[in-house]
Amino acid sequence: KKNAMTLNLGKLVFSNNSIDLKDHRYSAKTKGVNFADLSISRFSATLDDIDYDSSSVKAHIIKLTLKEKSGLLIHNLDAHANINTQRMEFTDFALKTNRSHAGDYLLLEYNKFHDFTDFNNKVRISGDLRDAYIDSRDIEYFAPALKSVNFKTAISHAAVAGTVANFKVRN
């Protein structure tokens, strides 16, 4: 029996990096963030307490910033992250984007990473939002079909669940 690889790192610091990720099996052009063709610039972050094994990675994300070619700006992301082949969980979550900010808890569930190419229908979102402000123009980066839906809302506390195509909010 082979031993699975594990890796434990104290800290990684990224400063003003560029990353291009292209899955050549998919050539469809999409508006908004295209998870099969990402181009990220101005990527900076500190990752603390990193634990990696063959099925998951855990880390404390501190001050992650980036710009994606779609125009999406992440001004700040802080969270304790746990990512594996079927879910991404962010606790103690604080996110600031182009026009929105949100926080507390976020869970993304999927059957495989390829599901992100159909983010609106295949990635299930659940979370607990506190003291959030959401501008629909930021959601549009992930759901370009919502271009004609315009709203801005302040949320003191809400539970969210569903896919972008079928989303529910409770307070």
Where do the PLM segments sit?
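Outer-membrane beta-barrel translocator/channel fold
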Residues: 132-137
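Elongated, acidic membrane-bridging lipid-handling scaffolds
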Residues: 2-103, 108-125
